[in-house]
Amino acid sequence: MQFRIEHDTMGEIKVDDSQYWGAQTQRSLENFKIGTEKMPKELIGAFAKLKRSLAVVNHKLGKLSLEKSQAIIKACDCILKGELCGEFPLAIWQTGSGTQTNMNLNEVIANKATEILGGNFREKKLIHPNDDVNMSQSSNDTFPTAMHVVSVLEITHKLLPSLENLLKTFKEKSQQFKEIVKIGRTHLQDATPLTLGQEFSGYASMLEHSKQQILESLEHLRELAIGGTAVGTGLNAHKELSEKVAEELSQFSGVKFISAPNKFHALTSHDAIAYAHGAFKALAANLMKIANDIRWLASGPRCGLGELNIPENEPGSSIMPGKVNPTQCEAMTMVAVQVMGNDTAIGIAASQGNFELNVFKPVIIYNFLQSLRLLSDSMESFNIHCASGIEPNKEKIDYYLHHSLMLVTALNPHVGYENAAKIAKNAHKKGISLKESALELKLLSAEDFDQFVVPEKMIGPKA
């Protein structure tokens, strides 16, 4: 391996000559050999979009030459095309402001831009990482800006489409199953009837609510900290910078961003991300409930509830031949647990905004993006490999429906609650049907029982 000598304000340091990064990135690599968690590539992409927009705006404001602006823009485009993906090796366990990652971007962009201008960054840097790429910026405002940019983009382009696909499937299943009457269950005990379609409509409504909660959380995530520089005052930044960068980012990404109205808030608090992740946690709770319901309803095949048949995707046991497990449901529930854990970490980290700056930014955005990615991927997987293939086991559903003692509820208006309870308890004690019990107790005639106890008429309120 060949090395070159790079320098920063702390002196000289050896850097792998094949890499574009510089001294500060190298120091971070050597000083923070902690864990395996690296800065997410999605965050690096958002940072590149931000640096690109800043190069455009700094030129428009007369602070950066056209030549340097265009070189920086082209270097950022190289990052966005994936041409420099091996240049961002830093761990999330670094300074809590994300300074090392900001400088990682600055150094790589500066050296690539120098090459674009025809120079050799190993000999002389035509673009300076601080003076040019980081012009009018601080890590304290660029990192939280990149956090919000990546959050909005990933929610818009990854999470919401996956959620919408699963929601669509449950809406379709709700219609497909609307004529299938089944027994309901509360407290894990038999309850009154409903249709399988009604049950699935509940799942669809849960996901619709989650979608709306996530959409609502987007509004404050659109607010960008850029222009606040070190402590929120905007020192060394043009007064029009923040508004113009938000406009440029919006135009370039095709997604709306605005300048945060209070930069002191934007630097020291991450309540917008904590709030958005709260919506993720609510979605995870809904997905956990749905996946659990489906695997219980599909339990069996001979000794469980068995009301649903789910796709058989792979062998389920290394010792029991022919066993097939609800693997997609299990994967979904594990994702939900991880998201709930991430929510706790984000909540604690977001509370640590001491004075003018929160210094838990990397761990906040790492966990946020992990939750987003896991939710998106698991919903897509669950939809394709499980939800879309769910079918009712009508024989089992009908058996449970007509053997449930809770059909006695339909008799309340005719014989009263206490007499209805006597019918149910007598039937359960003697192992006979509700009809047989009612006749034995001489509370109803056979004709009246058949008229009053009709499961298909018990699935909605009466006129």
From Swiss-Prot:
The record marks 330 as: Important for catalytic activity. Substrate binds at residues 97-99, 128-131, 138-140, 186, 318, 323-325. InterPro entries: Fum_hydII (IPR005677), Fumarase/histidase_N (IPR024083), Fumarase_C_C (IPR018951), Fumarate_lyase_CS (IPR020557), Fumarate_lyase_fam (IPR000362), Fumarate_lyase_N (IPR022761), L-Aspartase-like (IPR008948). Pathway: Carbohydrate metabolism; tricarboxylic acid cycle; (S)-malate from fumarate: step 1/1. The active site is at residues 187, 317. GO terms for cellular component: cytoplasm. It is found in: Cytoplasm. Its EC number is 4.2.1.2. It comes from the Bacteria. Pfam families: FumaraseC_C, Lyase_1. It is an enzyme of class 4 (lyase). Keywords: Cytoplasm, Lyase, Tricarboxylic acid cycle. GO terms for molecular function: fumarate hydratase activity. One of its GO terms (biological process) is tricarboxylic acid cycle. CDD domains: Fumarase_classII. It catalyses: (S)-malate = fumarate + H2O. Involved in the TCA cycle. Catalyzes the stereospecific interconversion of fumarate to L-malate. There are 2 substrate-binding sites: the catalytic A site, and the non-catalytic B site that may play a role in the transfer of substrate or product between the active site and the solvent. Alternatively, the B site may bind allosteric effectors. Belongs to the class-II fumarase/aspartase family. Fumarase subfamily. HAMAP family: FumaraseC. Homotetramer. This is Fumarate hydratase class II. It comes from Helicobacter pylori (strain J99 / ATCC 700824) (Campylobacter pylori J99). The gene is fumC.
